[in-house]
């Protein structure tokens, strides 16, 4: 059995199939050039335009859940390059997402920009922050809700990894979809500037 290819990230399942299907070199290039452990300036600009976020969470037994959040552009805010936050509005009282995050903080966020045909993945560890505490830490943010009513609480996420979701399979009304292409431009290139961002997984020295 192949040994893990340190120091790159990747789950055991990812590594198993990369070895099985012969994509290890391609995967390592992606990890090295497109995956970073922070938000790049272009990612921060991208988040400021987004009105929808998909959030995946998991309960302590491993059962997954996927939900969605909406708001005015920029409702998900980058507090710094390692941290983002979003408001939690009044819902149905079930607290599936927050319940999972309270017990298993790991979360995976996905943002899809259909206008620019590009996506962003952000993984990290989430913390539920009550409104009073958020107001004390970030008064300019908590005092200016971007929805129609004040949030009941906030979620703050410490970023572990972030990376592009390329545009090659995004639907487009005015042309063909580039199914399966390896063309760099068709996939969106280095849209988020990750290639020139210091990465703990880039061992090339450049």
Per-segment meaning from a language model:
Residues 1-206:
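Binding-site signature for planar aromatic cofactors or substrates
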């Amino acid at each position: 059995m192949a040994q893990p290819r340190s120091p790159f990230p990747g789950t055991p399942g990812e590594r198993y199939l990369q070895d099985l299907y012969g994509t290890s070199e391609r995967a390592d290039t992606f990890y090295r050039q497109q995956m970073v452990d922070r938000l790049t300036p272009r990612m921060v600009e991208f988040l400021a335009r987004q009105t929808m976020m998909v959030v995946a969470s998991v309960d302590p037994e491993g059962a997954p859940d996927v939900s969605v959040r909406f708001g005015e552009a920029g409702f998900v805010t980058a507090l710094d390059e390692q941290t983002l936050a979003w408001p939690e509005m009044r819902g149905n009282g079930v607290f599936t997402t927050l319940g999972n995050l309270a017990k298993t903080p790991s979360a995976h966020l996905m943002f899809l920009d259909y206008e620019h045909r590009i996506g962003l993945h952000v993984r990290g560890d989430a913390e539920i922050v009550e409104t009073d505490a958020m107001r004390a830490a970030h008064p300019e943010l908590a005092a200016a809700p971007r929805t129609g009513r004040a949030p009941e609480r906030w979620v703050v996420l410490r970023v572990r990894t972030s990376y592009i979701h390329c545009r090659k399979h995004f639907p487009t009304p005015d042309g063909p979809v580039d199914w399966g292409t390896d063309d760099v431009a068709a996939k969106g290139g280095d849209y988020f500037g990750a290639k020139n961002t210091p990465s703990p997984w880039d061992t090339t020295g450049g």
